[in-house]
Structures are given as C-alpha cells and as structure tokens.
Amino acid sequence: MQVRKRRGLLDVSTAVLVGILAGFLGVVLAASGVLSFGKEASSKGDSSLETVLALSFEGTTEGVVPFGKDVVLTASQDVAADGEYSLKVENRTSPWDGVEIDLTGKVKSGADYLLSFQVYQSSDAPQLFNVVARTEDEKGERYDVILDKVVVSDHWKEILVPFSPTFEGTPAKYSLIIVASKNTNFNFYLDKVQVLAPKESGPKVIYETSFENGVGDWQPRGDVNIEASSEVAHSGKSSLFISNRQKGWQGAQINLKGILKTGKTYAFEAWVYQNSGQDQTIIMTMQRKYSSDASTQYEWIKSATVPSGQWVQLSGTYTIPAGVTVEDLTLYFESQNPTLEFYVDDVKIVDTTSAEIKIEMEPEKEIPALKEVLKDYFKVGVALPSKVFLNPKDIELITKHFNSITAENEMKPESLLAGIENGKLKFRFETADKYIQFVEENGMVIRGHTLVWHNQTPDWFFKDENGNLLSKEAMTERLKEYIHTVVGHFKGKVYAWDVVNEAVDPNQPDGLRRSTWYQIMGPDYIELAFKFAREADPDAKLFYNDYNTFEPRKRDIIYNLVKDLKEKGLIDGIGMQCHISLATDIKQIEEAIKKFSTIPGIEIHITELDMSVYRDSSSNYPEAPRTALIEQAHKMMQLFEIFKKYSNVITNVTFWGLKDDYSWRATRRNDWPLIFDKDHQAKLAYWAIVAPEVLPPLPKESRISEGEAVVVGMMDDSYLMSKPIEILDEEGNVKATIRAVWKDSTIYIYGEVQDKTKKPAEDGVAIFINPNNERTPYLQPDDTYAVLWTNWKTEVNREDVQVKKFVGPGFRRYSFEMSITIPGVEFKKDSYIGFDAAVIDDGKWYSWSDTTNSQKTNTMNYGTLKLEGIMVATAKYGTPVIDGEIDEIWNTTEEIETKAVAMGSLDKNATAKVRVLWDENYLYVLAIVKDPVLNKDNSNPWEQDSVEIFIDENNHKTGYYEDDDAQFRVNYMNEQTFGTGGSPARFKTAVKLIEGGYIVEAAIKWKTIKPTPNTVIGFNIQVNDANEKGQRVGIISWSDPTNNSWRDPSKFGNLRLIK
C-alpha cells in the first residue's frame, strides 16, 4: 500500500490479511470489523468478493454528494490515507450534515455488504462518527444509524461497516451517509471508500421438515409427549405438538452433531404456535458441548413472545467455531412457562457460510490506555481464562489497558484440588502459576479468587473416606489445611484474596446461605476462613465477595458481617461483584458504597463488573440493539463517576471478562456485557469511561395516559395518571418535572421548573412532538414544537398549531401548563410518538432526550412516548378488622382482578379478586384467591402459593425502588416474607382457607406520606401459583405482565384514594 502521510499517522495494522481467496491479491476479510487493502478490489481472478463501489478522491469528488444544504466537499491535499488526495468535509451546520454515498440500484434488499472507509479528524479530541442508512421506498422515508464509532484526533482510522439493506420493491433511494453527529465545529476527511459484496453463491438448505411424515428424528426432551398433529399447521396438514410439560427446559429436540460442521454459520428458522389464551415466550435453544468446555452450555438462538392463536417465526443464526471438537449439538424448543403446550412447524437450517463476509481486527493501538486514564483513582483489572496466554491479540489488549488480573476459574477449589491421599489434600498449581508468571513479567498485580465458596468445590472435599459429611472439627482442620496451603503457595504474589464468596442469603433468618459449609460448621466457617488466611499471608488484603450487594436487605446483612470481622482485624475489604444489567438501579449501587465506606478503614473492590444489555431474562437479540449499547454506555459512565467519587475507598475495579465473546454470560444468549467487543475493539462503554463527552445521546422512553386538562396552571388529577418525566442538569440534579396526557389530537403538559434566576425573555420551556415517530435529520411536515417563555410569549414552527398556555409565578421556581393541538393528527391508544422537552435557563438548554439540543432541526434523538391507559382503580376510605373475615365495609369499595399474566394462563392458574381500603394509618387489602392446589414446599417464598402486594407511595414510577416503595408477601399459611422496603413492623395479615382457595386480609402501614382524599399511589398485587410438586407455574398480577414488580415500580397501576 502506498501511504502518503501529511499530518498524523495511518493505521495499517487494524486488519489482518486472511486468505479467503486463491490466486488473487485484493481485498481480504477476516473475523470482525476492519479491512486491509492490497491492490484495488476487483472481480478478476478467483476472488470471493466483488467491488460494488470504489472511490479514491484523486482530484475529484465524484461518487459522493453533500448531505446538508451548507456542506462543502472538496478533493483536498491537506492529508491523505492513500494517494495524493482525500475528501474534505467542511461547513457543517447541523449535527447530521455530512457525506452521502448513493447506492440506489447498486445493492439488493436482504443481501450482505461491507462499507469500508478511512476517516481523519484533527480537532484535538476524540469525535463520534456515524453511518446512517437512508431508505426511500413504498413504506416511506427512513434513516437508520448503523454505526457509532469514536475516532481519535490526528490519526487515519480505517472503519468497516457491515450492512444489509431492507426495502420494499424498487427503492427511490438507498444511500449511506457519513456524519459526525455530536459536533459541527471541525472538518473531517474521508479516503479509500469501498463497498464490497460476496459473490453470488447461494445459501444451502441442509435440513428441513414440516412434520408431514411424522416426528422423524425429533425426540422428547424430558418426560413429555411429542407427536405429529393435524390440529393446526403452519403449512401442509401437520405440525409437531409438545404436551405434558412440567419444567421449562422440557420440549422437543433433535441431535445435530452429525449435521452441523465446524467453522460455519447456520441460519435457523421455525414457526411456533400456542393457544393458552395469553401471550407466551417460546425459545429455540442449542445445547452444545465442545471438548474445551468444562460443562454443557445452553445458548438461546431466538426467543419470542407468541400471542395465543397465532403462528410466530423464530429465526436466528448460530456459529460453530473452526477448530473445535464437537461432543454434543442438540437443537430444542422450550418455554419459560413449564406447563405450556405448543406446536412447532417448518423447521429449516441453512448453511450461510458460503455467502458470509468475514472480518478480523487488531486491537486499537491509538486509543487511550484505560489504566492510564484511571491511574489517579484505582487499579483496573480484568478476569481471564488461561487461553488468553496463547493469543497475542488478547495479550496486547490486556497489557495495554489493565494493571490487575484475576483468574476466572483457575484459582477456585475445583481447579486447585487434585484429590486426597492418606488424609492429606493434593494440589495442582501449574495453571495458576502461569498467572503469577504473567503479572510478574508485565508489572501487574493479581487478585486471588476464591478460597471458600459453595460452588466449584468438589463434593468429596466435605466428606470422609466413607462418603459421610465431615464433623465440624474435621471440616475445620480441612479448611485450615486448604487455606494455609493455597495462600501459602502464593504468599507475597497474590495481593488480595476473595476469602469467602457469596455466603449471604437475605431470605434466611440469620441472613446466611444454607451451603454445605454452613450445614457442617454453622456460621463459624466465615470467621475461621479469614483467620486462617490472615495466618497464611499477613500482608495480603482479605475480602468478603458477593453479588447484588446493592440490594438493601442483602447490603445491610453484608455491612454487619464485615463490620464485625473488621473490628476483629480479620478483613480488609468488601468485594462488590456488580454483575448488573440495564435494569439495575445505579443509585442503589452508590447507596451501598456509601454505607460500606462508613466502616472504619474498609477498602472496596469492584470485583466482577459486567453489564448485560437486557432488562429481563427472556429477551434474546440476534444482534445487540444500538439503543441498548448506548444505554449501556451511559450507565457505565454513571457507574464510573460514582467509582471515582468514592476512590478514597474503592481501590480496584475489575471487569469480569476481556471481551464480549469471552463473557461467562454468553451461554443462553449474547449479553454483550463488557467494554471491548469480540473483535478486540473498544465499544461505546469503553468511551463512557475514557471520554464520556463523545457518547451519542440516549433516546429516552416513557409512557403517558389518556386524559384531558383545563389549562389554568394547576395540575389536574389526570396528570397524576402519567409517569413523571425528569429533565436533569449536568450534575444530575432535577431541573424540571413534567407530566403529560393525551386526547384526540392534543397533548397536555404540566411542569414545575427549578430556576434561580428571573430572566423572562431567556427562561422558558420547549415541547417537541413527532406524531409519526419517524426519525429524520430534518423536520417533517407533521413535526411540531412550541417554546413557551416565562414572559408568556410563544414560538411555534407551524401556524396551524393551537397552543394554550399558562406560566405560574414562583420564587426560584415556576410552574407551566400547555396544550398543543395538531390539526390532522389523531393520537391512538397503544401507539408511539416522538417527544422531547427542554428547559431554557438564562439561554442555556437542558433537554430530556436530545442532549445535543438540536430538536429544532431534526428528530433523530427525540425520545419515545407510548400512549396508553395505565391500570387505574379506587380505594374507598374505611377501616376493616384484619381477621380473615370479609367485613361489610369491603363491599363499599371497587373490586379489581388479577389478569396480567407473566406466567401461566387465566384459565389454569391462580387468580384473585381484590378490594382496597385506606385510612390515615394504613392501606388495607382484601384478596380472595382462587387456587384449588396449595403448596409451600419450595424454599423460595416467591415460588410458594402466595400473594404479593407492591406500593409506591409517591407514585414516581421509577425503574427502581425508592425509599417509599415496598414489596410485601404472605402465603396461604399466613407466613410473611418481604422484598425491598417491606418489613414485619408495617405488615399485618390474616389468612383463611376456603373451598378452592384462600382469603388474605392485609394492612400496610404508611411510611412516607399522610394520605388525603384524591391522593394517587402506585399499586400492584400479584398471585404466585405453585403446583403439587412445589414448582411455581403461575404469576398473575393486576398491572404488570413482566414479573418485574419486585425491582421495578414503573409498571405499577394507579390507585386513587377517595372518601
């Protein structure tokens, strides 16, 4: 390659040449995201690729056009990646101004392509670049962001964007637009633009069945029935019917070991059907075991919500790596509802590899080293499997970014114990010693994980030669021998140990897990473990390590445990694992750190950090959604702001995995939980830590209820039915709280704004509405905005829009109310609209969703509102007697029913009819539960036949529990248990068994409010249904079909207290 370097450096190591073409020196692709170029790509010779478009800009701008009315494109000799010229992009005035590459007529819908280009910018700071696919077809015009990539200054960056166009019919336009959407105050350069495609070869169908000739090679999975049924069929006359299921994993399966080959990617398709009367989740899963796997793995290919009475397609891809030895590959269908009967039809497996473009990338040398960015705060670590020591790319990434490591599994008891001989433990340290060698050679430190754990410890370790459990005395001696030997072997080499791991169970009376350790030794094993570790290496730092340390009940138990050990001089710190997700409340993590930090002399290590891109356990994405990756980055930013804030006590932050495909979470589904992707490339989550200012805005989501209001500056009751929307300032303080409702063609908005200054012409609020919810880099005709200044003047973008307004006076704050009526628009229930709101304070904008504050020019970063009707009920004033009898006063209040199904079905599982009363001291609940089979055998109280009550006193409907939120549970034997915020002091119950079920009467003491008539609180009630085997088979509540009320009050219904 000819390289002309004028300013900065050209990265020529971003891609490794991999021979996928014979006798042709051209463009070569490998396994991830950037190309490396030899000669110009062409279709000559025996090539696997062909060139769709190639642009070099040598004295010309041909092949591209400006996107944006003021953009200027020139062929420039300022700087070039290859040859003498590059394309200079300047005079951008909108964030979505850039360069458009027209591919109309050059690409096909559904085909795979690669856009490769090199980009350069010299702004002296990292900058975010985007690629946007523009489509105009029979469905209309749309703009989809298909790439977010951060590029450092003064460096030619080679970028590869896989894309697959999707359009209906012959499109009027299909193009790709390259922009830098965060800033317009710099110019950038493009060079060596190419679009490539694999040559036509056609996917190959390797397996297909429609069950017209019976079940074939399919087998029952577990004790179930499978048969070819003519009851329903997606095609033909038959489908596969699975019945008599009792457990979630049970279903139908087929052995594919002899059918699927290594080094190939397969597309799986199947159609599924169920007629339970409710939506159900059905999953297509691969059970696999390679010789390199320690145990069998279960990986979701696709999960889908299947409406009752409809056929739904499950489709996804599955890759078998080259070079592995396959021991088991079994495809099966399952459901999280353990008793669901369902049908499968038209199963197809396609070998896609022949049409696949492969890419391989090197770690990015030019980006900042994480350990250098954070060196003034704490050590930065990573958990590693031993295989990384054989991979030069892994080693490069590790040594660049980290100064601490943890052996992922190789220092756990099952890895170190080789057996027992003559009563003495035998050990194997060979693999673990490789970690010590690595840190010594690279100037790092290592954390030891873990000494005492209920998992990954051999069963024989707890038994004598006759297979009986050891006595407490013998177990104590074995514990001492193990810890003295292991810690002694690594004395002076391992700087910190997770001595005891996951010993706390908040559902136990004393808060401790009933492990084999506890069974033999009681709680004493914890203190003894620390005592023996301190004896073996007095200089090593000793930690108690656990997950979900931020959940309030578990947090408090850990606090008391560690405080006691610290006072005895036996412990140095707390290990907070932080296996979290997008649903995790970051505020709770800070509260836990804050509480733990009050223990004198304590250290905190974040020991196992990863963040799933999911909010639940059932979703399964074929590719990580862009919005999820952006949200992951924003949460990572918040998390590290907290870590740095408490760096006086936090001394190590360790990621549990080097890159996404190495994560322990990538078993049933891809979670994409780490800061580097499978190709060693930095994700947005990495930049959230290093340069958070480059992150794309996080489009917000909320929902509002149907309702009307009179615009007179008062918050009508209808507003209380909608979830509040908060606008924050740079420090995270609430700048404004607004509520909105909708009716016909009008949106009503009421808000309260914090504003310390009084500048009527420079203070105000702006409301933006995108009725069709289409995201475009310009305003469409229906897009509407209205700016209301505190001097009552308004600015609107459309003359036909009707705006009613009110601005209320106030000291250091003010209220406002608006109604915006848009002619020609009719809002409908369960539809979505684009929406944003901004506060203007002294001329400065603070926005809810689009933090670039460019809402007047485009809708790309508007938030989304779902127009819905939240469950609403009333509770009458009155005080019943809590005795299990139905007093007459209960008949004075409204009856509601549990109909929101999270598991099971309305006709087969337990439900309840519910009434609610209130007075100044208590909220009262009556539930008449229909449940003919009562069981409480399960040790988990939420899996017993029981009723759960959830309240949100301030009705904030946050995605996490605030201090006023609480969860209470009582089973049919009147045994109480509690989730976050609940306690026996606030909960009175009486239960009476009746024919076909039971009655629950409960009183919940108010905690943070003094209720008055017309107060609206958040409320939900849930019925848990166990079968005769003690398995939970039903979860049906009043308002939340997601089964997330235990951690997320946002889907509670609204309960109005009336006289």
From Swiss-Prot:
Keywords: Carbohydrate metabolism, Glycosidase, Hydrolase, Polysaccharide degradation, Repeat, Signal, Xylan degradation. It catalyses: Endohydrolysis of (1->4)-beta-D-xylosidic linkages in xylans. It comes from the Bacteria. One of its GO terms (molecular function) is carbohydrate binding. SMART domains: Glyco_10. GO terms for biological process: xylan catabolic process. Residues 1-30 form the signal peptide. The active site is at E502 (proton donor), E608 (nucleophile). InterPro entries: Carb-bd_dom_fam9, CenC_carb-bd, Galactose-bd-like_sf, GH10, GH10_AS, GH10_dom, Glycoside_hydrolase_SF. Its EC number is 3.2.1.8. Transmembrane segments: none annotated. Optimum pH is 6.2. The keyword Hydrolase applies. Residues 200-354 are annotated as: A-2. Residues 700-870, 871-1059 form the CBM-cenC domain. Optimum temperature is 90 degrees Celsius. Thermostable. Pfam families: CBM9_1, CBM_4_9, Glyco_hydro_10. Residues 47-199 are annotated as: A-1. Residues 364-692 form the GH10 domain. Belongs to the glycosyl hydrolase 10 (cellulase F) family. The C-terminal CBM-CenC domains mediate the binding of XynA to microcrystalline cellulose. CBM-CenC 2 alone can also promote cellulose binding. This is Endo-1,4-beta-xylanase A. It comes from Thermotoga maritima (strain ATCC 43589 / DSM 3109 / JCM 10099 / NBRC 100826 / MSB8).
